[in-house]
Amino acid sequence: MRKITLACAATLFCVLVALGGCSTHSQEPNNEPEEQQASSQQPVDVRAAALKGPTAMGLVKFMDEAEAGTVSDNDYSFQIAASPDELTPQIAQGSLDIACIPANLASVLYNNTDGAVRVLAVNTLGVLYICDSNGSIQSVVDLAGKTIYASGKGSTPEYALNYILEGNGLTPGRDVTIEWKSEHAECVAAMTKDSQAIALLPQPFVTTAQMKDDSIRTALDLTEEWNALQNDADASSLITGVVVARADFVDEHPEAVEAFMKHYRESVAFVNEDIEAAAEPIDTYDIVPAAVAQKPFPRATSSAWKVTK
C-alpha cells in the first residue's frame, strides 16, 4: 500500500491503519435471517456534508434517492458547503456525523478532538492545477515573483502547494505571494478580470474558468509536480479528500455507517459511468452548472470519487 505523506498527514495515515475504516469490534455470529435483522433495526438519523466539487458530485445520486425516499434504511440529510471552515466546527461539536473533507483537515480534527474523528475512506486524489492566461508558467520555477490566487488556506491546497514550491527551491511568502480567497469561485473571478492572474484551482472550477475565458489554461498539474518530487516507486500519493465520521457515531451505529458507505460507493459509480445523467442533479444541487460538470469528468474520473473502505 502506498504511504500517505502529505504534510501534516502522517497522523492521517496512522488513523487509516489503526482504525481500519468503520469496523470497530468483532461481533458474535447472528443466525437470524437477513430480512429479519434488517426489519428489527430502527432507522438512524445520519447527518452528512461535503464540499462543492468532486466529493459533492459523487454524492448526488445518493442525495437524490434519500430525498425521494427510495433509500429508506436510515434517515439521511445532506449539506453542501463552499468552504471547509463551514464544516470544521460542526464536526467537532457533533452536529455532523459524516463529512467529506480535505485530507489534512481530517488529521487536524483527529488531533484536536483527541481521536474523536475517524477516517472511513479516501475519496479524492489529485485534482489541483495552476492556471494562467498568457502562457508564462511553464514550470514551477516560473512562479518565482508571481502572485497566486488560491482558496483552501489551512487545508490540502495550501499544504500541497507549499510542498511543491519548496521542493523546487521557492519559499512561499518570500519568493511567491499567495493571496488566499474564501472560495474557489473568487479565484475564478480574479482570473477572468485580469489576464495576468495566476490561480490554484481544482476541477471542476478549472472548467468553470475556461468556459468564462477560453484563454485560461492549465499550466501545471500539481499531481504530476508532486510525483516528480518523489524518489522511489513506494513514495507518497497526493491525496486531496477523505470521508470522516465521528468516532462515537461509528461505535454506536456501525450498521448505519456501513449503509452510508454502500450508498456512497453506488453513487460514485453512477457519477463515473453516466456523465450526462449525473450532470443534471449536480446542477440541481447548485454544485456546478450541468455544462461545467460534464466537461472535467474524463480528466477527473481516474483520480476522484474512488471510494475505498
Identify the residue ranges that each predicted region occupies.
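An extracytoplasmic/periplasmic, membrane-proximal ligand-sensing/linker region
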Residues: S40-V44, Q210-D213, E276-K309
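Pocket-lining segment of extracytoplasmic ligand-binding domains
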Residues: N104-L105, T113, E179, E186-P281
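Short, solvent-exposed loop/beta-turn-alpha elements that line the ligand-binding surface or hinge
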Residues: E67-N74, T223-S236, S302-K309
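Surface-exposed acidic, glycine-flexible loop patches that form ligand/cofactor-binding
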Residues: C8, V140-V141, D251-E252
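Short, glycine-/small- and polar/acidic-enriched structural segments
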Residues: E28-K181, S195-Q203, S215, A219-L222
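Short, low-complexity disordered leader/linker segments with a strong preference
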Residues: M1-D45
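Flexible glycine/proline-enriched surface loops and loop-helix/loop-strand junctions
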Residues: A144-K146, V242, T301-S303
